[in-house]
Every structure is written in C-alpha cells, then in structure tokens.
C-alpha cells in the first residue's frame, strides 16, 4: 500500500505536467504563431510582389535570373524550389562542391568580361544554406552592372544609382549586412527601359 501511494505521489504530477505541456506545445503555441502570422503583412503567406495585379514572386524566396540583362541571384542547390529548400550539404573540401564553385566562376567570368576571378564575391559562386536566398550584397549586385549596362544600352552610373536606391541598410544600423533584393532590383531595372 505504501508503494502505491509513493507511485501516485510521483506519477500523477508527471502525467499532469505531460498533459499541460502537450496542450501548451501542440495547441496553444501553434495557435499563437498562426494569429501573429495573420497580423503580419502578407498574413503569414509571405510578402508577395505584384506587377499589374499578378504575383511575380515573393520577397523572401530567391528566383533564378540567368539572362544577361538581369542581375543574377545567388546559385541554388535546390534549383530554386521552395518546397525542397536546402543547401548543397557539401563541405568546402568536397571535390563535387569545388567543381560546382569552379563551374559558377567560369560561367560568371564568361558573361562578365573584364572581371577578375578574385573580384567575384563568394555569394555569386557558392550555395547558401537555404538554397533560396533572395538577396545579394551591394558588391554582388554592383559587379554585374557593366554586363547589364552593355546588354541594355544603359549608363553604368544609372545602374549603380539603382543598386544604391534598392540597398537595404542593416537593421538599426548594426544587425546584419546591407543587402539588395534581386527580384525588386530586376523589376526596377525593367521599369528603367
């Protein structure tokens, strides 16, 4: 009898705590996140980019731009597939990874005459952790300006100003790097014509 009382003393509180945590973690927390998501711009579905009332992309999901008249995005190991978002999972000493990086370097140099290998920002030739980065550094965008200026027959100075205008500063001036959203930049580029 004494053993049963001791078991009740320990098991009942453990079961109660388990039930409380299941309700908290499986019901209340997801509901709270869903409500907060609905209060954000885009209502938790992501910030859509519209052109003439049509969705052309999302600000937080990178897209492939490979035409010389556009700023190129960062390479994607996931093929820009949002459902299969992932990095390459290959380390910097992996021979396959090194081949991929070299292929990206060769492609970039072939399309950007006058640029030296050591001038290319790493983000333009390496995969990101998510495979869907929508942003580049200002340097990653500016190194592409000459190619785009030639193809579109625009002034390079005009394009440098465009990049500067679309550069988002770090949050509160200290959190994170300056960045340029490639989709927004390319849409603004189309409006220059």
What are these regions (language model features)?
Residues 1-2:
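N-terminal amphipathic/basic-hydrophobic helices that include classical n-h-c signal peptides
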Residues 5-6, 13, 26, 31-151, ...:
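Flexible, solvent-exposed loop/hinge segments and secondary-structure transition points
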Residues 147-193:
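Extracytoplasmic/periplasmic C-terminal soluble domains
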């Amino acid at each position: 009898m004494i053993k049963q009382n001791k078991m009740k003393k320990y098991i009942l509180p453990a079961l109660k705590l388990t039930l409380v945590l299941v309700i908290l973690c499986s019901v209340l927390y997801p509901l709270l996140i869903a409500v907060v998501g609905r209060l954000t711009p885009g209502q938790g579905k992501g910030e859509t980019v519209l052109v003439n009332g049509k969705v052309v992309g999302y600000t937080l999901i990178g897209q492939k731009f490979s035409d010389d008249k556009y700023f190129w995005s960062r390479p994607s190991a996931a093929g820009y597939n949002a459902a299969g978002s992932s990095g390459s999972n290959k380390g910097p000493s992996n021979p396959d990874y090194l081949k991929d990086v070299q292929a990206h370097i060769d492609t970039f140099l072939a399309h950007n005459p006058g640029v030296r290998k050591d001038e290319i920002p790493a983000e333009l030739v390496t995969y990101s952790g998510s495979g869907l980065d929508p942003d580049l550094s200002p340097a990653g965008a500016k190194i592409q300006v000459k190619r785009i200026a030639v193809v579109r027959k625009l002034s390079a100075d005009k394009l440098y100003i465009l990049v500067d205008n679309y550069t988002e500063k770090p949050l509160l001036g200290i959190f994170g790097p300056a960045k340029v959203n490639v989709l927004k930049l390319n849409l603004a580029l189309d409006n220059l014509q």
